[in-house]
């Protein structure tokens, strides 16, 4: 069932290849398929003919099948005709008949969810498990719904609440949590479902493909609480935690329920997990903590909008504050470049946010002033750089960023100026440089932000500072292009003119040499 918005729940395979009445525009007549006239009659909803056949002498073979192994009982269950189901069972129809697709009357009845039909089938000896070809039991099918009455009936007749399907090793409890069915979760927990069961862990072989970027593959290994966290089922999470679910049990990538809830904008569920003592400082394989994720999600552009507001009562900013109050370390840094997300126009271009990125750098990149204030209040380090030498000040100024980036796409110059002021007041050095030797002024020039240029100059930044290629901020404002001719930095004539003017007004200091 599991991606990250993380892995999707496995879909039910079609249990009956002919289960749609409108499968063929021209219905098959009884005469056209003589070997199974009763099956054809029921399939075509010719219930009067079917009842007449059952009442006739000699009686028809109620175990007859069509070419795919489907019986009249299969179709009677599918059409939810309780009376016809009972007539067929009294006539000794095979209650456990399995067609070529692994479907039994019981597995189909679980899809329909009619308790009367289920009770009849069980009365006549149906296998309460009735797994399909993938090992999905009748209880698993019901667990995805809120049909608690039907599930109780199966459990009363011995259905295994800890059975696993063969595809991903998922249990009924996992299905219930993944589909946000708290009443079903409670029922399964009350009858002994394992709250810490884990689905199959996928060991993907390393492969080299024509696609140059690393591709994520579902790692599996989800617990019921991880499914609830991904779905944002707060009620499910409360039940599972009360029943003893491990709040910090991770998937193979180190993703905790708290982190997963946050990554999926499920802030109410994340806040609950913080309140019940989840470890706020656990990070995953990439070094993402819940705090980093909360800051990231708070201004993440999706769907062409500046952000995608969560439908939860808890806001992203409230979650950030809750995490900080609970002791979240504001200075944890990314260990690896984080995986791509299913985001609009996200092609992994956010290369600035790489190894060493802190929540403060991410907030500065997005111009998230409220989050920056909170992080600084709780001790965020303004000097910690990424491996590319990007500090919070340089991130705020736009260094190493691109219009192709996902994060910070809708940041404004006004936000950048406010972020710079905040950071300088908190101790950032105006002369900080990245791995290219560029200063915050180079970043402002990259974006053509004249007011930011003036703000930096007002704080005595060196307008003559050159990067490792000997370029001043004015040179950057002139624009650059790659060997193919595609502009990597758009030209900003007004910004270049402003910088040339400022350079003329300030004598080049001796220290303005290329670093």
Model-identified regions with their sequence ranges:
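Leucine-rich solenoid repeat scaffolds
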Residues: 463-504
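Ankyrin repeat domain, specifically the short helix-to-loop turn at the C-terminus of the second helix
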Residues: 54-60, 86-94, 119-127, 153-160, ...
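Start-of-repeat signature of ankyrin repeats
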Residues: 34, 69, 102, 135, ...
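Bacterial N-terminal signal peptides
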Residues: 8-18
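Ankyrin repeat boundary/linker residues
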Residues: 66, 99, 132, 165-166, ...
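N-terminal segments that cap or nucleate solenoid repeat domains
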Residues: 26-75
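Conserved ankyrin/ankyrin-like repeat signature
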Residues: 49, 83-84, 116-117, 149-150, ...
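Ankyrin repeat A-helix N-terminal signature
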Residues: 40-44, 75-81, 108-114, 141-147, ...
